[in-house]
């Protein structure tokens, strides 16, 4: 969901697909932490792993409102809600569609 918004907002020209996915993974972990699905230790391990391989460009600048609106164009959006597949502990995910706009905007880290 996050990666598709990144790719669409940049017209697939600024970041590779892998970079967009890695950036999106960090955002998903941010949301998961804010929602209480993962603890700080697991969150930090995941972020450190992504950053260790230097696959998520830093310093990306997006308009948060445009980014949020773009997420509703994703194939996972249904009935006016954005569905997120979020980490929920080791080797586990949860699918949610009840994240508030504030939670999502905060998760962007922009």
Predicted regions mapped to residue ranges:
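Active-site segments that bind and position negatively charged phosphate/pyrophosphate groups
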Residues: 1-62
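C-terminal charged capping/lid subdomain of soluble metabolic enzymes
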Residues: 37-110
């Amino acid at each position: 969901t996050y990666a598709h918004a990144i790719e669409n907002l940049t017209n697939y020209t600024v970041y590779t697909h892998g970079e967009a996915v890695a950036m999106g993974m960090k955002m998903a972990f941010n949301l998961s932490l804010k929602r209480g699905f993962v603890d700080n230790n697991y969150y930090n391990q995941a972020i450190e792993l992504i950053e260790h391989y230097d696959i998520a460009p830093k310093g990306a600048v997006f308009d948060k409102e445009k980014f949020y609106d773009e997420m509703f164009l994703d194939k996972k959006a249904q009935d006016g809600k954005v569905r997120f597949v979020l980490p929920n502990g080791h080797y586990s995910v949860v699918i949610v569609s009840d994240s508030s706009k504030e939670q999502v905007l905060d998760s962007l880290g922009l």
